[in-house]
């Protein structure tokens, strides 16, 4: 994959909006997972911390940690795209993410569900600061992170006996 053009403005939009969301992580983590389940109710079984419950648990530390990882890694990806023109996640981290997502049975459409939930959460959290430019910047960063994870998942699949 060649270099990706990610502008300073796109990077700034992602960083600034992440700073706003970080101010209420519990609320936006809950909103994020609620959106995932609203879009794709069957996704519940893919998350160990949601399997045995009928609703998104309010004070589940694993839920919060997972949501924060998605937002943080997307934000870090935006910075890398701007600085290096590509996604540079530590090989071990990317391998781990590929392995975990592969073993959990994650498929391409699942990444789109997460992206839609991410966009809805941004819209909710940013209010009037949300616009198409913000959505575009986050979407581009997320898409490239998802591509990197999917590449590792294919690697994991090809190593199966």
Swiss-Prot record:
<dbReference type="GO" id="GO:0005737">
    <property type="term" value="C:cytoplasm"/>
</dbReference>
<keyword id="KW-0963">Cytoplasm</keyword>
<dbReference type="InterPro" id="IPR012292">
    <property type="entry name" value="Globin/Proto"/>
</dbReference>
<feature type="binding site" description="proximal binding residue">
    <location>
        <position position="101"/>
    </location>
    <ligand>
        <name>heme b</name>
    </ligand>
</feature>
<dbReference type="Pfam" id="PF00042">
    <property type="entry name" value="Globin"/>
</dbReference>
<feature type="binding site" description="distal binding residue">
    <location>
        <position position="66"/>
    </location>
    <ligand>
        <name>heme b</name>
    </ligand>
</feature>
<feature type="short sequence motif" description="Homodimerization">
    <location>
        <begin position="38"/>
        <end position="42"/>
    </location>
</feature>
<dbReference type="InterPro" id="IPR000971">
    <property type="entry name" value="Globin"/>
</dbReference>
<dbReference type="InterPro" id="IPR019824">
    <property type="entry name" value="Leghaemoglobin_Fe_BS"/>
</dbReference>
<feature type="binding site">
    <location>
        <position position="62"/>
    </location>
    <ligand>
        <name>heme b</name>
    </ligand>
</feature>
<dbReference type="GO" id="GO:0020037">
    <property type="term" value="F:heme binding"/>
</dbReference>
<comment type="subunit">
    <text>Homodimer.</text>
</comment>
<feature type="domain" description="Globin">
    <location>
        <begin position="5"/>
        <end position="154"/>
    </location>
</feature>
<dbReference type="GO" id="GO:0005634">
    <property type="term" value="C:nucleus"/>
</dbReference>
<keyword id="KW-0349">Heme</keyword>
<dbReference type="GO" id="GO:0046872">
    <property type="term" value="F:metal ion binding"/>
</dbReference>
<comment type="function">
    <text>Phytoglobin that reduces nitrite to nitric oxide (NO) under anoxic conditions (e.g. during flooding or in waterlogged soil). May not function as an oxygen storage or transport protein. Has an unusually high affinity for O(2) through an hexacoordinate heme iron because of a very low dissociation constant.</text>
</comment>
<keyword id="KW-0479">Metal-binding</keyword>
<dbReference type="GO" id="GO:0016491">
    <property type="term" value="F:oxidoreductase activity"/>
</dbReference>
<dbReference type="InterPro" id="IPR001032">
    <property type="entry name" value="Leghaemoglobin-like"/>
</dbReference>
<keyword id="KW-0560">Oxidoreductase</keyword>
<feature type="short sequence motif" description="Homodimerization">
    <location>
        <begin position="108"/>
        <end position="120"/>
    </location>
</feature>
<keyword id="KW-0408">Iron</keyword>
<dbReference type="GO" id="GO:0019825">
    <property type="term" value="F:oxygen binding"/>
</dbReference>
<dbReference type="InterPro" id="IPR009050">
    <property type="entry name" value="Globin-like_sf"/>
</dbReference>
<keyword id="KW-0539">Nucleus</keyword>
<comment type="similarity">
    <text>Belongs to the plant globin family.</text>
</comment>
<feature type="binding site">
    <location>
        <position position="48"/>
    </location>
    <ligand>
        <name>heme b</name>
    </ligand>
</feature>
<protein>
    <recommendedName>
        <fullName>Anaerobic nitrite reductase HB2</fullName>
        <ecNumber>1.7.2.-</ecNumber>
    </recommendedName>
</protein>
């Amino acid at each position: 994959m060649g270099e990706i053009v990610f502008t300073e403005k796109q990077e700034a939009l992602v960083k600034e909006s992440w700073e706003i969301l970080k101010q209420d992580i519990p609320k936006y983590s809950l909103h994020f997972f609620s959106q995932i389940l609203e879009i794709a109710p069957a996704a519940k079984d893919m998350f160990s911390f949601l399997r045995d419950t009928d609703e998104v648990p309010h004070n589940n530390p694993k839920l919060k940690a997972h949501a924060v990882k998605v937002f943080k890694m997307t934000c870090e990806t935006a910075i890398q795209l701007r600085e290096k023109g590509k996604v540079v996640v530590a090989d071990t981290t990317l391998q781990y993410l590929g392995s975990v997502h592969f073993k959990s049975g994650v498929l391409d459409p699942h990444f789109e569900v997460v992206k839609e939930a991410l966009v809805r959460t941004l819209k909710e959290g940013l209010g009037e600061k949300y616009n198409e430019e913000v959505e575009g910047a986050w979407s581009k960063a997320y898409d490239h992170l998802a591509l990197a994870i999917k590449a590792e998942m294919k690697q994991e699949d090809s190593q199966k006996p």
